[in-house]
Amino acid sequence: ERHTQILDEESEFSVEDLIADEMMVVTVSNAGYIKRLPVSTYRKQRRGGKGITGMETKDEDFVRDLFIASTHQYMLFFSNAGRVYWRKVHELPRAGRTARGRAIVNLLELSGGEFITACLPVRDLKEEGKTVFMVTNKGVVKKTLLKSFSNPRATGIIAIDIDEGDELIDVQITTGEDNILLATAKGKAIRFPEKDVRSMGRTARGVVGIRMEDGDSVIGMSLAADESTVLTVTENGFGKRTKVGEYRLQHRGG
């Protein structure tokens, strides 16, 4: 008696089904070079060890971002022009430990003068309750639901409408319940609840997050939990550590 059955059925199959779900170290340099390599490349050492070279950089270049992400995760790339691009981690160039990697401009369809200012690893683009919080050089902030970025396009899509002369400088994934800390080049800072900023569509401009004097600009953003501390470092190497609670919580636009 024959037990073999031939079924006339179709099943969905993608190249990703053949790619192992492996944890990778993704590094991005300030000059815009990116690469990935397995976490296992970095052997565990004791405290006080010398460490190993993780990326070769040219003069005046340095590693700006480092992420641990699965090969099946997405990387969202946000540009200074307010656009967002996608790549799966397994699509990023795999290179040796000391290699520079590949220029991001050769991976994404960027316009002239456009460069990447923020990278975010994301497992599920349709995850409920997650938002994307953005800030520009001139202090404009905007919050958009993560699922609004779930339809990738090779040419990217608008993440925020940028005013002339302004640039997107930082992006974070938030829960909708976080506190936001913005810092400026002249040493000013503001901490306000994320709830002060309503969710907006992708093409919206955003609202004022901090008001600044002429010549000042926002240089960074952090999620500021009440029990955390803030490390502030100046261009000349001076630094200090401050409890977040010393930055009083106020409304956005202060």
Task: Identify the meaning behind each predicted range.
Residues 1-254:
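Short, structured "edge-of-domain" segments at secondary-structure transitions
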